[in-house]
Amino acid sequence: MSLSANAENWMSRLPDETFLSVVSIPGAHDAATGSGWADGMDGLGDLFARTQELTLPQLWSCGIRAFDLRPCVYEDYMNLNHGIVPTSVHFEDALRLLCDSLRANPSEFIVVHLLHETDGDQVSDAYNQRIQELLQQEEWQDCLIDFRVNLKVKDMRGKMLIISRDKYATDPTIGAFFQNWTGELNWAKQQNARIVGKRSNTARLCVQDYSDTHAPGGVEKKVEAINKVLDFSTQHKTTSSSGVYWVFNFASAYSLVESLFGIEISSSDGYRDNATHTHAAIIDYLSQNEPGPVGVILMDYAGIDQSGDFNTRGKELVEAIIANNFRYLADQSDVSSPSRQKAEDDALFTLEGKQVASPSSHKAYIRKGADGKLRKKLLKH
């Protein structure tokens, strides 16, 4: 089965009444590492810290809508780092770029996984205050949204939801906090995570973030963990806000290491090698199993099928996750069409989400009626 999809403004085809937690969203782990390194850091970054080859604008263009951003504190600004290695991207510039992308494409929305990269701090004990001040800037207030359990696609269009792993204040300035995050392969702990917003808005969260696969059997454990979460997420039914269950399923990890000052640490090729296994596993899962939501999948080398000597299949995976939405959301016949354009009579789309001008007989399509509703349709002649 082909799972390719058109990435441009792909969220415009999502039904408005869909709960946000039900959308399958492709994401980029350490998203800024494809945008280059700070002066003098090219060698270190390319060997140890690169997880992406595409820049932030290129990731957006290929369909990425979840961004893992890891700010740290410098004297006059906040920088995006991967560990000790600084990228060339200031956090403020990344927010500006993403907001500009949303303003230019108001059908789309973004989820940000935010994590304080403490190893990169050049100023101590300043993160909490600085992050609050930055998130309060007037420049992007039109783009940011507070978390609610019952958020739907229609609420999110043109918006960015920032969810922080660090509790930088009693309540989030905007967005939400992650709670009980775990990198362990312990199913009870993985299902005990939460997303906590203002005014007691709390949603259940299942998380898989097993990040070190370089030991013998590590990759196999990672793939098994990914598939276990996929089994859970694709079979979980959300018919009301009480059933909302978020999922963050990391494809990212490193399976090879390099030595730095006598210490074995993650390597860029380690992220590449791991991706060859995890990306293939997810692509196979989506093509071989009944469709259903996969949540947010954060991957390395997103949008890139070949990185160096490694067959990462990152473009194929992004397209498969996008296309997956239109395999299961088409079954929801009572949801309204997401398009902000005037609905047309009998507009037909393939199950992968591509509009069809001349449909073939004896094939299944998604029909968007004049009432804006989506239904499956089999053409018999």
Segments the model singles out, each with a brief description of its role:
Residues L329-Q355:
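Residue-level detector of functionally pivotal "anchor" positions at catalytic/ligand-binding pockets or at interdomain
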Residues L59, R70, V112, I162, ...:
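Conserved, mostly hydrophobic/aromatic
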Residues C62-F67, N105-V111, W140-Q141, M156-M160, ...:
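Loop/turn elements at helix/coil->beta-strand transitions in domains of secreted/extracellular proteins
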Residues S2-C62, E75-F109, Y254-D331:
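Long, acidic (Asp/Glu-rich), low-complexity accessory segments flanking structured domains
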Residues A364-H381:
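C-terminal tail/sorting-segment detector
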Residues V73, N105-D121:
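Active-site groove signature of glycoside hydrolases
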